[in-house]
């Protein structure tokens, strides 16, 4: 920040940055319309994940404890596809902004493949060492066993999550914020939450099987994401 302010000639965007917070109404309206679906998406997605966890909780406190351990470890590995998704948004967004649509499409395809490949490697590592992490917790053997199983399920699903996450950021880079809202949070409430509720409350399936089937709904998003990205609906000239 200090460097940017000391080198105003190289950072012309800082000129007049502190003169006021006024914004033309038309520009504000555009930002609000584009940004609102993203804000609502994060809100409803978080609420959906909380509801799914509540569905699991009807199977006992041991399940929640196991999930907490598994989620903590899984989130460390999930950083890979989360950050690669953000990279897709930046790189593809730059190409779209420059009007280089073919380069944007080529870069997007390569980065999606790279993301899935990296997460496949990370998933293999999770499967190999996932059982070690629960052992560092001072808890019961039942909870450790559940956590190990949940980690294994997350590892199996991770490459699919990488693809859907990449698809999400591809659509977002093209300004399709309403589509991403439908693709993410609406899908969570229409598909994931009902599946978790029915399986956890009205079936005799073990919690690991329930968790696997709920996580496997990601495959539906893979199909949807594939056709949406392939349709090039996101491939638009931004300026």
Set out the residue ranges of the language-model regions.
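Hydrophobic positions within alpha-helical transmembrane segments of bacterial inner-membrane proteins
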Residues: 43, 47, 119-127, 162, ...
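Membrane-helix interface segments
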Residues: 62-63, 177-178, 206-207
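Short runs within selected transmembrane alpha-helices of multi-pass transporters and secretion channels
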Residues: 1-2, 82-85, 154-173, 179-191, ...
